[in-house]
Amino acid sequence: MKRDIQYLLNPALQNIATYRVEGGQQAEIKLNQNESPFDVPMWLKEEITGEFIKEPWNRYPDILPYRGMQVYADFLGISPDSVMMSNGSNEMLYTIFLACLGPGRKVLIPDPSFSLYEKIALLLQSQIVTVPMLPDLDFDLEAILRTAHDEAVDFIVISTPNNPTGKSLTFEEVRLIAQSSDAIVLVDEAYIEFSRQRSVLELIDELPNLVVLRTMSKAIALAGIRIGFALANPLLMAEIAKPKIPFASSRLAEITLSMVLANYSLVTDAVSYILHEREKLYTAMLTIDGVEPFVSDTNFLIIRVSDAGSVFQNLQSQGILVRNVSGYRLMENCLRFNVGLVDENQQLIAKLRQF
């Protein structure tokens, strides 16, 4: 081949880096991916696999995971026509972005936010309009409203509670954004179970331009099974479904979802623990010299230190893996870590006191 292979690829790839997790995904104390510290109990895993082995493995699952969508619709008390299940919420992000964006279309993204938003928008050769957070990492609501209007954006994506900042918009603030804009508004509620704010799910019938994204990877503790959902009014959902990859969700995912939701007290107990430990961690961080914690509305905390790179490496060398988020706007020398088990949290506190 005489031509450079790069000229045969999507030119947008030149502006995109491969997604990676600094420090890897293995550690004695792993606190870098905002996962639940609690695995699904073995008795429930055995019940799930007992059901799964009855399924035909040589046959494709349904084109769309109708069983899983019905189960989640019943759990939420909404119409199944308002529900779309995916192989993790990241796959659903790709689906929604494909349905809403394309070359030249404008997407508004508060900055910093989940990095995958910008990556998908760049792949689709869309124009990204960023709105910086305030210095305390809170959303700048007025700037979002003003920019959405002045730039006539086509799509707005808001992570609330937000990753990586841990801050949230209120129910009424999200409603105002969606009411005030002619754009599709995607609200990523990956961390909603940990939030002091209430979900905007009840607004999907009132606001025809609103889409709510959910994941089963955080509070529900199913990161390894890959389950996500989009929730919207049926007319909008029918359009979003058009680029959805067929057969993407496995029967195992549907069975797991059904049986975990049937034992939801496991989730509520875990969330109660995480919220309690989150406050204990925050209080402890306030007592450590050189550590500035930020109030969190998620299952993770953000702290600012004098040298995040050095602290990150020192923790990693001692078997504790956190996330260095210093590369994000306004987050210089910041580290992020999710709530772990009691002993893990205590070890993290002890190590930070040594620096």
Swiss-Prot record:
Domain of life (superkingdom): Bacteria
Pathway: Amino-acid biosynthesis; L-histidine biosynthesis; L-histidine from 5-phospho-alpha-D-ribose 1-diphosphate: step 7/9
Reactions performed catalytically: L-histidinol phosphate + 2-oxoglutarate = 3-(imidazol-4-yl)-2-oxopropyl phosphate + L-glutamate
GO MF terms, alphabetically ordered: histidinol-phosphate transaminase activity; pyridoxal phosphate binding
Cofactor entry: pyridoxal 5'-phosphate
Gene3D superfamilies: Aspartate Aminotransferase, domain 1, Type I PLP-dependent aspartate aminotransferase-like (Major domain)
Pfam families: Aminotran_1_2
Keywords for this protein: Amino-acid biosynthesis, Aminotransferase, Histidine biosynthesis, Pyridoxal phosphate, Transferase
Modified residues annotated as N6-(pyridoxal phosphate)lysine in this record: 218
Cross-referenced SUPFAM superfamilies: PLP-dependent transferases
EC number of this enzyme: 2.6.1.9
GO biological process terms, semicolon-separated: L-histidine biosynthetic process
Subunit structure: Homodimer.
Family stated for the protein in its record: Belongs to the class-II pyridoxal-phosphate-dependent aminotransferase family. Histidinol-phosphate aminotransferase subfamily.
PANTHER family: HISTIDINOL-PHOSPHATE AMINOTRANSFERASE, HISTIDINOL-PHOSPHATE AMINOTRANSFERASE-RELATED
Protein name: Histidinol-phosphate aminotransferase
Phylogenetic classification of the source organism: Bacteria, Pseudomonadati, Chlorobiota, Chlorobiia, Chlorobiales
Gene expressing this chain: hisC
